[in-house]
């Protein structure tokens, strides 16, 4: 399976690349529209602030293509990349996102931020989080969540071909790799069956 990891200057692309290769993916780190269109799936990583990330994506000219690709092929956002999938964020200044999943990004209410460390999600397995903002979306889009200081944090979201992981699966040990492998297998089923 060929995965285009979007290179827009805001992601830890090499750790993501290493994790994807470990589960058998062919990876291209790119901002080339031709390579993105040729991929079986798209992965949008992200580390940093929402406004700067959207500015960087706009600077590459990729925003219209990414919106189109999300309707045609599996699309995964990780950490800030997941937040960018939504309509908007209040981080810094109100900023429009990609709008691939209905919802918004807001600052978490916890007294101790950023949320850095390991928290349980599915099957009481721990994954690694680093963030101060979280998504607010319809319950139907939330696949799994974590609890941070009494606050529910959507950890995995999904709508159509679009999936997001708020945590870093590439830094979450064998369970993180297993989640990436499950995503890969769902992409391969999509390629094989068309659904």
Regions found by a protein language model. Name each.
Residues 135-195:
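C-terminal and late-domain segments of enzyme folds
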Residues 1-73, 80, 106, 175, ...:
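N-terminal beta1-alpha1 cap of cysteine-dependent amidohydrolase-like domains
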Residues 49-54, 83-93, 167-169:
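A short secondary-structure junction motif
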Residues 10, 82, 134, 171:
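Short, glycine/acidic-enriched loop or turn micro-motifs at the edges of active sites
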